[in-house]
Swiss-Prot record, chains A, B:
An example Gene Ontology CC term for this record: cytosol
Name of the protein in its database record: S-formylglutathione hydrolase
Residues making up the signal peptide according to the UniProt record: none
Modified residues (N6-succinyllysine): K4
Amino acid sequence: MALKQISSNKCFGGLQKVFEHDSVELNCKMKFAVYLPPKAETGKCPALYWLSGLTCTEQNFISKSGYHQSASEHGLVVIAPDTSPRGCNIKGEDESWDFGTGAGFYVDATEDPWKTNYRMYSYVTEELPQLINANFPVDPQRMSIFGHSMGGHGALICALKNPGKYKSVSAFAPICNPVLCPWGKKAFSGYLGTDQSKWKAYDATHLVKSYPGSQLDILIDQGKDDQFLLDGQLLPDNFIAACTEKKIPVVFRLQEGYDHSYYFIATFITDHIRHHAKYLNA
Amino acid sequence: MALKQISSNKCFGGLQKVFEHDSVELNCKMKFAVYLPPKAETGKCPALYWLSGLTCTEQNFISKSGYHQSASEHGLVVIAPDTSPRGCNIKGEDESWDFGTGAGFYVDATEDPWKTNYRMYSYVTEELPQLINANFPVDPQRMSIFGHSMGGHGALICALKNPGKYKSVSAFAPICNPVLCPWGKKAFSGYLGTDQSKWKAYDATHLVKSYPGSQLDILIDQGKDDQFLLDGQLLPDNFIAACTEKKIPVVFRLQEGYDHSYYFIATFITDHIRHHAKYLNA
């Protein structure tokens, strides 16, 4: 599992690095970013995974979210993968901004031609953690996950499909009920085919209804002026209703005047990192 | 002086906006970013001008520096212009990344074909402040300036050439002695011609030697692993020697392991905004 370092920049006393590797799950080269806080120089740290939204690479979060100060203070290694395989020469992979490249939706595709490469679910939950645990000073037992929009969807389903794997989960403007929203219908029909039962296995609102697991403290921030909320792409109300019914605690904060941008994320990122640090450093 | 709003995003309770206008000085359309902190809703705030470095637009600083939290807390309106005129159809304007587009060097060009458009000094010190004072809730008497690299050079010369105009000045990795460094020689010979006395009028190290002005508290952060420092583009030692001789107080902090990137700026931006707030809110 050879890693090639692409960049390394000092930031808030730690190091923001980007690496490239040949992904076995995705059958292509993948980049990921990893932040090593000062504490990582002298011991193992918890690992916090960030999943980005549509059209993003590993760069958007590390350059725009302003997360480094709190990650440095709380001593968290923060990992941010790319949002899909790239350069797979699949016909149509670059045709839309909400499907294919930059839009892997954190699922394992079952349909041709996507199934050979589009396995972001297994990449994020299996291959990447194994790579991180093997190459960086992280404690494999202390892992949490969060994300934005499509990445918020990814964080929620990874946590709900793996009870106990993550200490905590949070999301910014997550796609909460993809089986019912335009983005989700387009992605799931393309990657998973027409059998909607396969869709539900990657839908947070459905997963909550049958969540058998342990305590899961979910934090969600949502901008009230988020165009995609108004367009019915995110559907947080459905998710909250399902959590309420199942008595799963979720803190949902509707933020007046905020939108879907990284300005919204930057404003509340410290709260989210504090949320995770509470569990990761417990 | 019609302003066209390009974008507006809520961030740390304030609004990060970008506007476009027809610049009289530069004879072209120019964009600038302005952050209005929550305090700007109820009263006039001080104005802090940021000047960016080579290849930047108004976007780099507002999306990568993480300045919003401290600007919001200290109640400062922060303005970030672009780094040169654009789209002027001057032969060669886009040929190099360190001259022409994205590289206006904050001077008023005297040479053809640049002198018609390349008047960034007057734009930054006259036209933009007049525009800001006329259109935003700012106190014209309370203004400070800071910048990075070429923008650090810009901030230093604007302050040194206008004693009393700015309450404070600071810089990240500034080009301190452009008449002696490759970037400066290329830019000044192109914009100002071969008469080196004209160059010195835009060189911070020379300007300090004849600075008649009032108290000026200068803060400079410089990454010790900054490739451009090692390449002799920045020359801070010359500037510090000149300040020492003239007994002008300058705090110069050499930061171990840091480079020229926005990760370096993000790490110390709060210190700089606090530095300015001390004088602007005095």
